[in-house]
């Protein structure tokens, strides 16, 4: 196995992780929307979900940056 194969395997693992994180991010968005539509929304729970959603977004961006090489123009 050479470095390219290891890099490809790593990229595939990152892509899988990204897909999982994106799905969880979307699910949290749906949950927040559903909670906000309730007559008496639980603002503490909504805030917790939003913080988790933001943390997921940060991780998604970090992983996307790993996949994209830095290109200096």
Residue ranges and their predicted role:
Residues 1-8, 29:
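Short, charge-rich amphipathic alpha-helices with coiled-coil/heptad character
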Residues 11-73:
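Amphipathic, hydrophobic secondary-structure cores in small proteins
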């Amino acid at each position: 196995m050479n470095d390219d194969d290891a890099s490809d395997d790593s990229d595939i693992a990152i892509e899988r992780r990204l897909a999982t994180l994106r799905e969880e991010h979307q699910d949290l968005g749906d949950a927040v929307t559903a909670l906000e539509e309730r007559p008496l929304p639980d603002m503490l729970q909504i805030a917790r979900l939003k913080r988790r959603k933001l943390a997921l977004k940060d991780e998604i961006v970090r992983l996307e940056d790993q996949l994209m090489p830095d290109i200096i123009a």
